[in-house]
Amino acid sequence: MTYKTSDLSIAAYLMMKGMKLLDATRAHNGQFMFEFDDPNGKGVQLAIEFTGSECAVYDNHVRNLKKILYRN
């Protein structure tokens, strides 16, 4: 069983939680796809857990800082 996500932040969180990255690709349209080994079916649960974590708060601050830097 595998878990796939196109969200870079969730992918990093899953790696931090010990999930093994099997593949990382970039489509012609620029979209990323990360595939993880998920033998216990915990990918969805961990992705939901990410939304309420300190990691999500950090990620949001990084995004806001990028908006400030790249505003033109």
Model regions: which residues?
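Acidic-enriched, low-complexity/disordered segments with a strong bias for Aspartate over Glutamate
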Residues: D7, D23, D37-D38, D59
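Acidic, low-complexity, intrinsically disordered interaction modules
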Residues: R26-E35, P39-V44
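C-terminal basic regulatory modules in eukaryotic proteins
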Residues: P39, G43-N72
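Aromatic side chains
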Residues: Y3, Y13, F32-F36, F50, ...
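N-terminal acidic leader/helix
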Residues: M1-H28
